[in-house]
Swiss-Prot record:
It comes from the Bacteria. One of its GO terms (molecular function) is adenylosuccinate synthase activity. The gene is purA. It comes from Shewanella piezotolerans (strain WP3 / JCM 13877). Its EC number is 6.3.4.4. This is Adenylosuccinate synthetase. The lineage of its organism: Bacteria, Pseudomonadati, Pseudomonadota, Gammaproteobacteria, Alteromonadales. It is an enzyme of class 6 (ligase).
Length: 431
């Protein structure tokens, strides 16, 4: 029987999920996105050729894989078409490989306008959203006024629903935010123009996945962003608008949670965060600059500079707990090469001197703490491109072993470079 594997980020995103998903899809029949939207950026490097995907699952480059966008994903038709056209120019037969849930909420131009207007109005209290309409689209879903992909297939009813929701949002844009209204006729025309094309790729995702499971076909679920950005369990309100944790698989795809076999947590050997929000181990010094430069820490979606810091075990333990992590994939180990010492956060100290080994439940709590750091010897030798544990310096092996001890969870995969070949699979999640 095939296994059903979840791959998700355990930090604030940008952990290197795209490469690992691409590597593991060699063994999968289906790759499923279950949350987020085109705010995610997954970078794949294959034989030196870089491809950045935002919406379509990372398995799209493999001819043995069907890629699925589940109902938990908010879908921007224009962004989807841009990505499809980019892939088709590279010779990828997207229509043969991509399937979409009719229940995906649509991101339309007024969602993006609202997103940008709100961020501007927040001033120095801005959350740091990508401005791509993700949050407003999820809001419409929860308030039950949102339009879904399936609504496009009845033009008359879609036009009626669109008029109603745009009247509501344009009122907010013009009267509250003092911005221009979004044009209804243009929005309607653009949306309906690709209705038939989208319909050709739509399917009942829950039924398809259940039939695949019963047939013993391996399924890989691809998470976007990271655990600490989860709407419920992250550093609220500096979070995304979806459930980035393993629980989101069931709600975002219609796949039964009892049928998940393995949860692979992707963990960078240090930590980064992009945008605003608390970050206890942030390094605003020359070491932070070193990690940011060597790690090429710029967002794949926005191009924004990421904020680097030491690995935070307190936050990682919460990720293990929430996601039932079976094993970790450690990425960007090579970025630590050349440091005389490396540090790990093992506790949070509060102003009254108490030390906690569990995370707070909101941003305000994180802002009170200072990290309790454990120092380990660094290594001068390179780990870049290593393909076996025996090739690693002893100090790097000691670092990995210490992480496993602290997290009480094995590191089953080690990544030592951006290419899919620069990876050590110690335990195969699909085996």
């Amino acid at each position: 029987m095939g296994k059903n594997v979840v791959v998700l980020g355990t930090q604030w995103g940008d952990e290197g999920k795209g490469k690992i998903v691409d590597l593991l899809t060699e063994q999968a029949k289906y790759v499923v996105r279950y949350q987020g939207g085109h705010n995610a950026g997954h970078t794949l490097v294959i034989d030196g050729d870089k491809t950045v995907l935002h919406l379509i699952p990372s398995g799209i480059l493999r001819d043995n894989v069907k890629c699925i966008i589940g109902n938990g994903v908010v879908l921007a038709p224009d962004a989807l078409m841009t990505e499809i056209n980019m892939l088709k120019e590279r010779g990828v037969p997207v229509e043969e490989r991509l399937l979409i849930s009719e229940a995906c909420p649509l991101i339309l131009p007024f969602h993006c306008a609202l997103d940008m207007a709100r961020e501007k109005a927040r001033g120095n209290k801005a959350i740091g959203t990508t401005g791509r309409g993700i949050g407003p689209a999820y809001e419409d879903k929860v308030s039950r006024r949102g339009l879904r992909v399936g609504d496009l297939f009845n033009a008359e009813l879609f036009a009626e629903k669109l008029k109603e929701v745009m009247a509501y949002h344009n009122f907010m844009l013009t009267e509250y935010y003092k911005c221009e209204a979004v044009d209804y006729e243009e929005t309607l025309k653009d949306a309906l123009a690709i209705a038939d094309y989208l319909k050709s790729m739509c399917t009942d995702v829950s039924e398809l996945l259940d039939q695949a499971r019963k047939a013993g076909e391996p399924i890989l679920f691809e998470g976007a962003q990271g655990t600490l950005l989860d709407i419920d369990h992250g550093t609220y309100p500096f979070v995304t608008s979806s459930n980035t944790t393993a629980g989101g698989v069931a709600t975002g795809s219609g796949f039964g949670p009892r049928h998940l076999d393995y949860v692979l947590g992707i963990m960078k050997a240090y930590t980064t965060r992009v945008g605003a929000g608390p970050f206890p181990t942030e390094l605003e010094n020359e070491i932070g600059d070193y990690l940011g430069t060597k790690g090429h820490e710029f967002g794949a979606t926005t191009g924004r500079k990421r904020r680097p810091g030491w690995l935070d075990i307190v936050a990682m333990k919460r990720a293990v707990q929430i996601n039932s992590v079976s094993g970790f994939c450690l990425t960007k180990l090579d970025v630590l090469d050349g440091l005389e010492e490396v540090k790990i956060c093992v506790g949070y100290q509060y102003p009254d001197g108490t030390v906690a080994t569990t995370t707070p439940l909101a941003a305000e709590g994180y802002e009170q703490v200072t990290p309790v750091l454990e120092t380990m010897p660094g290594w001068s030798e390179t780990t870049f491109g290593a393909t076996s544990v025996e090739q690693l310096p002893q100090a790097a092996m000691n670092y990995i072993k210490r992480l496993e001890e602290l997290l009480e969870t094995p590191i089953d995969i080690i990544s030592t470079g951006p290419d899919r070949n620069e990876t050590m699979i110690l335990v195969n999640p699909f085996s």
